[in-house]
Amino acid sequence: MKKIFTLLFLMVTPASAEKLSLDAVSSYFNTMTTAEAAFIQSNDDGSQSTGRMYIKRPGRIRFEYDPPNLALVMVGGGQVAVFDPKANAEPIRFPLRQTPLSLVLERTVDLARRDMVMAHTNDGPRTIITLQDPDRAEYGYIQLVFTDDPMQLRQWIVDDNSGNKTQIALSDWTQDQKMPSILFNIQAEMQKRAN
């Protein structure tokens, strides 16, 4: 009787979703031209911030934070710029290649070909892929969390390899909207803030 119950239980329990293939995830990024989403950023210290994220592939992303934060993070021209409205100084700038985010902002993403996938698992309806640039392991890794049906990036976690983790949860996606390039122009933003 116990075996029959177990068999019936297995028959009515839905099978776990299969993980998305690396080729499917690569195609997801490669076919994305522009995207916009709401985000919630969670930091190691327990603090949270919200805002809007804008992506224009390849190589550009913008995070506009909601009040009271009002920070702005821009990626364009191979650079990352962090604008802090509390400081009347130039933005903090560093090369995009020094962040794991560069792996998904490349012109052509090919996860199956490059030796950057550290882990590729699924957790029910979610596929989790952990990426690290093998040539720049000192800059940490990024963990991407996707749902399928429809396939969508829902979250990422960046570990900077010095013990700091930042989690970004995404919702309210829109894709392939017109987006002016000025949104990602760091020099133009600096000039605007100087006036």
Residues of each region from the PLM?
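An acidic-aromatic
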Residues: 48, 52-103, 166
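A short, Trp-centered hydrophobic/proline-enriched beta-strand micro-motif
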Residues: 27-46
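Gly/Pro-enriched, hydrophobic low-complexity segments
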Residues: 113-114, 118, 122-195
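Short, solvent-exposed helix-to-loop capping segments enriched in aromatics
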Residues: 29, 99-111
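Short hydrophobic/aromatic-rich beta-strand segments that constitute the beta-sheet cores
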Residues: 39, 61-65, 80-83, 129, ...
